[in-house]
């Protein structure tokens, strides 16, 4: 599986969980929390801090783990904000082409 296919698959799962909630799903617990969009945003902040600390402290074994957590929670937050992943990818592509 390619890197982009893995991210696309993860995105598809997040979208599907929002459309078809699954009891006990972590994604659904974030998307349906009483705090609304604040819950996934709190997780983005938490995971960003953990990622920064892992990098700053040179904890190479934790950097990839924290980056994965951050990426996952960013995807959930994007979905909660009704922003499709394709818009983010288009923006990245546009920045790449402008070089």
From Swiss-Prot:
Its main location: cytoplasm. One of its GO terms (cellular component) is cytoplasm. It is found in: Cytoplasm. Gene3D superfamilies: MazG-like. InterPro entries: HisE, PRib-ATP_PPHydrolase-like. It comes from the Archaea. Pathway: Amino-acid biosynthesis; L-histidine biosynthesis; L-histidine from 5-phospho-alpha-D-ribose 1-diphosphate: step 2/9. GO terms for molecular function: ATP binding; phosphoribosyl-ATP diphosphatase activity. Keywords: Amino-acid biosynthesis, ATP-binding, Cytoplasm, Histidine biosynthesis, Hydrolase, Nucleotide-binding. Pfam families: PRA-PH. PANTHER family: HISTIDINE BIOSYNTHESIS BIFUNCTIONAL PROTEIN (PTHR42945), HISTIDINE BIOSYNTHESIS BIFUNCTIONAL PROTEIN HIS7 (PTHR42945:SF1). Belongs to the PRA-PH family. HAMAP family: HisE (MF_01020). This is Phosphoribosyl-ATP pyrophosphatase. It comes from Methanosphaerula palustris (strain ATCC BAA-1556 / DSM 19958 / E1-9c). The lineage of its organism: Archaea, Methanobacteriati, Methanobacteriota, Stenosarchaea group, Methanomicrobia. The gene is hisE.
């Amino acid at each position: 599986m390619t890197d982009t296919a893995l991210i696309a698959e993860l995105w598809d799962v997040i979208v599907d969980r929002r459309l078809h909630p699954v009891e006990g799903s972590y994604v659904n617990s974030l998307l349906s929390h009483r705090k609304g969009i604040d819950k996934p945003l709190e997780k983005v902040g938490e995971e960003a801090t953990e990622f920064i600390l892992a990098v700053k402290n040179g904890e190479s074994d934790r950097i990839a783990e924290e980056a994965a957590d951050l990426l996952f929670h960013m995807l959930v937050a994007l979905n909660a904000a009704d922003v499709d992943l394709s818009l983010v990818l288009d923006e990245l592509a546009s920045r790449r082409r402008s070089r």
